Amino acid sequence: MAATKSHALVHRVLAECPVTKARACELQMPHGQVKTPVFMPVGTQGTMKGVTADQLRNLGCEICLGNTYHLGMRPGPEIMKKASGLHGFMNWDRNLLTDSGGFQMVSLVELSKVTEEGVQFRSPYDGKEILLTPEKSIEIQNALGSDIMMQLDDVVSSTISGPRVEEAMHRSIRWLDRCIAANGNPDRQNLFAIIQGGLDAELRKQCLQEMTKRDVPGFAIGGLSGGEEKDHFWRMVTLSTDHLPRDKPRYLMGVGYATDLVVCVALGCDMFDCVFPTRTARFGSALVPWGSLQLKSKQFAKDFQPIDKNCDCPTCQRYSRSYINALFKSDTAAMHHITIHNIAYQLNLMRSVRESILQGRFPQFVQDFMKTMYGNKDKYPQWAVAALETVGITLQ
């Protein structure tokens, strides 16, 4: 398959599913190779909560996320430069993606005001007024030295409709141009555009049309997984992948539930991130192919099996459900063990998805995955059934 060299990224499409829009690709970046489809664990302040860089490496993680909003506040760009960027700071020699800080605007909306210039908000650390402009976002990300940087976009909640959505879409295009102009390191850092337009098909198409004219190395599908109905969600995903170029990576932001990952690979997405596996671990929830186990529950007090006997992660190799259940009463190590397992689960799921695409059996993989996850066809989520139907998979 032909490789496309764009900026600091070489993108190869290795295999495409003849039935669905799923594909297996390879990205070559400054810190090595990333095989897609891929799930990227999220470390808000340069660390995965409860997991070290070494442990991530040992799980075979090729790329993870850092958060510009938090790292730009503390410890700040000056310290980052002295530490040789985020890679040096967190002792991580593989690829890093940093977000622009835009998403935090929605979650901390009481702190922020959006104008054409940028986003104004009070620092949650010291209460100072800060203006995050597209230029400032790129300046911070250049200091962080991430392999993939995200443009600053004007983020509105996916449940909002009306003129604000259109305004945000047009502004995101203008801000993309400002981010491209501000990138002081295009031969080492890849700047991805973010497709906006809410749940409005026409606005999404307009945004796709404009942004795909820009010479950027990759595209993200933004403004989704913010509480909108799943039926709207998958339609916007497939609309986006229909209009995105084949020769560039497609990153669906904020998606991490196993079913969503599998369905969205079928719809043509390559990269995913979400805090879900690490956040849910803190509440004692371990991810398994048939759903999840609530390990705090007393039903596991005398259960001496591993979380999942087919999982090769350090937690499943060493500890029982009973042991982790007991730890929860006294020790934060329980969360640590489940976090390791949950990240391993996500990474392994995506490896299996990828293998099935390379071997030409992805549609069968999807059938088996759904059967294992839900058991009975009556329990399949209707949105997933409908979405898969549009790409040639009729669930049995």
From Swiss-Prot:
InterPro entries: TGT, TGT-like_sf, tRNA_ribo_trans-like. Catalytic subunit of the queuine tRNA-ribosyltransferase (TGT) that catalyzes the base-exchange of a guanine (G) residue with queuine (Q) at position 34 (anticodon wobble position) in tRNAs with GU(N) anticodons (tRNA-Asp, -Asn, -His and -Tyr), resulting in the hypermodified nucleoside queuosine (7-(((4,5-cis-dihydroxy-2-cyclopenten-1-yl)amino)methyl)-7-deazaguanosine). Catalysis occurs through a double-displacement mechanism. The nucleophile active site attacks the C1' of nucleotide 34 to detach the guanine base from the RNA, forming a covalent enzyme-RNA intermediate. Its EC number is 2.4.2.64. GO terms for biological process: tRNA-guanine transglycosylation. It is an enzyme of class 2 (transferase). Residues 254-260, 278-282 are annotated as: RNA binding. The keyword Zinc applies. Gene3D superfamilies: Queuine tRNA-ribosyltransferase-like (3.20.20.105). This is Queuine tRNA-ribosyltransferase catalytic subunit 1. It comes from the Eukaryota. The active site is at D99, D273. It is found in: Cytoplasm; Mitochondrion outer membrane. It is a peripheral membrane protein. GO terms for molecular function: metal ion binding; protein heterodimerization activity; protein homodimerization activity; tRNA-guanosine(34) queuine transglycosylase activity. Queuine binds at D99, S100, G101, G102, F103, D153, Q196, G223. Its cofactor is Zn(2+). Zn(2+) binds at C311, C313, C316, H341. Transmembrane segments: none annotated. Keywords: Cytoplasm, Glycosyltransferase, Membrane, Metal-binding, Mitochondrion, Mitochondrion outer membrane, Transferase, tRNA processing, Zinc. Heterodimer of a catalytic subunit qtrt1 and an accessory subunit qtrt2. Belongs to the queuine tRNA-ribosyltransferase family. One of its GO terms (cellular component) is mitochondrial outer membrane. It catalyses: guanosine(34) in tRNA + queuine = queuosine(34) in tRNA + guanine.
